[in-house]
């Protein structure tokens, strides 16, 4: 029996919608990264973009455990002298709630062109509404802890 190797033209993509209300950031991000990469499919191939589209709603209601909402920091630099910026999780979730989840998922995907293509299939919305009803997304229930 020959080993099956999936081709890019044979990929079947589904659309999933995930409600982030009261979900822990890291645990939800790992499940989203798995869906985006296609690792949940028996036809997974690390060099083919075989993942599904993921829509996340209620990103503003995502949570962290412990004291991390006050202590977790996000850093960036403008490459100019004195251009170092730091913002806490609490400040970032207040201004741009979708960026928190995008940063977490981005760190779990490959740092290549393939990873950027997979991240483009992630659609995050702060509130409960999304404009992707025409794609008929399936409701994805994140795995329970334990």
From Swiss-Prot:
Gene Ontology terms: biological process: negative regulation of translation; translation
GO MF: mRNA binding; structural constituent of ribosome
Highest rank taxon of the organism: Bacteria
Region (Disordered): 126-146
Keyword Ubl conjugation: no
Keyword Iron: no
CDD domains: Ribosomal_L13
GO CC term (a single one): cytosolic large ribosomal subunit
Record keywords, A-Z: Ribonucleoprotein, Ribosomal protein
Residue pairs linked by disulfide bridges in the UniProt entry: none
Gene3D superfamilies: Ribosomal protein L13
Pfam families per the UniProt record, alphabetical: Ribosomal_L13
Function: This protein is one of the early assembly proteins of the 50S ribosomal subunit, although it is not seen to bind rRNA by itself. It is important during the early stages of 50S assembly.
Family: Belongs to the universal ribosomal protein uL13 family.
SUBUNIT field: Part of the 50S ribosomal subunit.
HAMAP family: Ribosomal_uL13
UniProt-recorded name of the protein: Large ribosomal subunit protein uL13
Organism of derivation: Roseiflexus castenholzii (strain DSM 13941 / HLO8)
